């Protein structure tokens, strides 16, 4: 049984916990502790009730300073200094770093100082982390000696499996991406101050361009794609689910049926459970609470001049990513166990 702690119990932290109980991985992973500055009653309430994902199927109670979910008792901490957390005493195998404030490797090593064996970061990190993983594409690179690992971003997890499939079958020459991302909690409900002037504006009233490093994230996972992609991102007035509009120039000549067939086979085969495929006339809310990293919308596939391909991909940017955090954590432990067996 893997003993884990969650540092930062916001959208991703809570999704990780709920996904664990819904995914069937509860027999492999135990959440021992949560570190979150919010008040315990707010933690309990937002675990039980969620505007996006609905009411949690488990009963959640507070007893003697612990969060009780069924028969599980989870210790709660409210510590701003991660070096003061009792991860060693609690024998924590992996910390899910989901606070959004500990981004660089050096900052995340505070958990190692506190006694945790490994850290899995829920966002892109600095180049000096031991590995940046998109589960299903490069998790085989995990090694026993890796202590600080990044799970990349939700959009990187969405697009990289598709690029990997296209490149292996047809050769990718270049690409341009537009991420159509739901609003996030770094935006404003009504106009208010922010360092990014566009994010000073009300999230529910505008389509808002924001910076993205998605193209660089693709390169980190697929080095062959270096300098081949550029990306822009806009935030839209929805609270969950993201679409990615991707245009790719391929080496080989293709048509719509060939592209869709290859992606459908990948979804049934190597990327089963990670990549999805649909030819139904669906909209964004239909992908809410979808555990897969990416779903190809086959109705939107277009091909121009045999080489320029346009695709539309969907993902639940919270739930899909939370499920990959669980998958990557198990892969980290398997890598560690493989060395000990040798």
From Swiss-Prot:
* Catalytic activity from the UniProt record: D-erythrose 4-phosphate + NAD(+) + H2O = 4-phospho-D-erythronate + NADH + 2 H(+)
- Give me the residues that bind substrate, please: 153-155, 199, 212-213, 235
Taxonomically, the superkingdom here is Bacteria
The entry's NAD(+)-binding residues are 11-12, 317
Query: Does the keyword Oxidoreductase belong to this entry?
Result: yes
Q: Name one GO molecular function term.
A: NAD binding
GO biological process annotations for this chain's record? pyridoxal phosphate biosynthetic process; pyridoxine biosynthetic process
Residues annotated as catalytic: 154
Biological or metabolic pathway of the protein? Cofactor biosynthesis; pyridoxine 5'-phosphate biosynthesis; pyridoxine 5'-phosphate from D-erythrose 4-phosphate: step 1/5
Q: Where is this site: Activates thiol group during catalysis?
A: 181
Give the GO cellular component terms, alphabetically.
cytoplasm
Q: Keywords assigned by UniProt?
A: Cytoplasm, NAD, Oxidoreductase, Pyridoxine biosynthesis
| Primary enzyme class | oxidoreductase
* InterPro entries per record: E4P_DH_bac (IPR006422), GlycerAld/Erythrose_P_DH (IPR020831), GlycerAld_3-P_DH_AS (IPR020830), GlycerAld_3-P_DH_cat (IPR020829), GlycerAld_3-P_DH_NAD(P)-bd (IPR020828), NAD(P)-bd_dom_sf (IPR036291)
Enzyme nomenclature, EC number: 1.2.1.72
Compartments it resides in: Cytoplasm
Name the family the entry cites.
Belongs to the glyceraldehyde-3-phosphate dehydrogenase family. Epd subfamily.
What is its biological role? Answer: Catalyzes the NAD-dependent conversion of D-erythrose 4-phosphate to 4-phosphoerythronate.
Quaternary structure, per UniProt, is: Homotetramer.
Q: What is this protein called?
A: D-erythrose-4-phosphate dehydrogenase
Task: Say which species the protein is native to.
Answer: Shewanella denitrificans (strain OS217 / ATCC BAA-1090 / DSM 15013)
Classification lineage: Bacteria, Pseudomonadati, Pseudomonadota, Gammaproteobacteria, Alteromonadales
